[in-house]
Amino acid sequence: MKVFGKWDASEVEIPDLSVKGYINLKPRIVLHTGGRHAKQQFKKSELHVVERLINKMMRKEKNTGQKQIAYRIVEEAFDIIHSRTKENPLSVLVRAISNAGPREEVVRLKYGGITVPKAVDTAPQRRVDTALMLIAKGAWQASFKSRRSIQNCLADEIIAAANYDVKSFAVSRKDSIERVAKAAR
């Protein structure tokens, strides 16, 4: 089975070993589980990574709850990615996720009424979630009040994050999160 009937997931390799267990590329007929994972902890890592991206894309006001629109946006963005890079869009997405997920974050600890920032390692599932959220947010921000379509903006964001380009919203936010964590060590 292929994603969107076009892209084979069996040839995709996950470069980052820490998130390998949390990026699911098992073949599915339809990328729609209907929220069966919602009540169980850590079950969202069993969702296909493209479905998780689709779910992140339907978070903004206009597309809230409209999965078919988000499905079409991601499908057309994958076609654009393939036409620009001549690669499998799934492998480009997996590289983008591993490049855009922050490895270190900051938590706030209270010591006697004083708040002290402390750097902590990020869990692998949170890295994947944060990377997908930053990619979707960057695409929405690039297309807001712009003539460019959301499909083009999503494709640009994924390609830039896969190439570790600082022009990518996701990569620049990841760098700023890690910079703050480095200062809080």
From Swiss-Prot:
Gene Ontology CC entries for this record: small ribosomal subunit
Q: Does the keyword Ribonucleoprotein apply?
A: yes
Complex formation: Part of the 30S ribosomal subunit.
Q: Which key words are in the record?
A: Ribonucleoprotein, Ribosomal protein, RNA-binding, rRNA-binding
A Pfam entry, by short name: Ribosomal_S7
Which Gene3D superfamilies does its entry note? Ribosomal protein S7 domain
For this protein's source organism, the top of the classification is: Archaea, Methanobacteriati, Methanobacteriota, Stenosarchaea group, Methanomicrobia
Gene Ontology biological process terms, A to Z: translation
The entry's family comment says: Belongs to the universal ribosomal protein uS7 family.
Question: Can you name this protein?
Answer: Small ribosomal subunit protein uS7
Fetch the PANTHER family from UniProt.
Answer: RIBOSOMAL PROTEIN S7
Q: Which species is this record about?
A: Methanothrix thermoacetophila (strain DSM 6194 / JCM 14653 / NBRC 101360 / PT) (Methanosaeta thermophila)
Highest taxon above the source species:
Archaea
Molecular functions (GO terms): rRNA binding; structural constituent of ribosome
Protein task: One of the primary rRNA binding proteins, it binds directly to 16S rRNA where it nucleates assembly of the head domain of the 30S subunit. Is located at the subunit interface close to the decoding center.
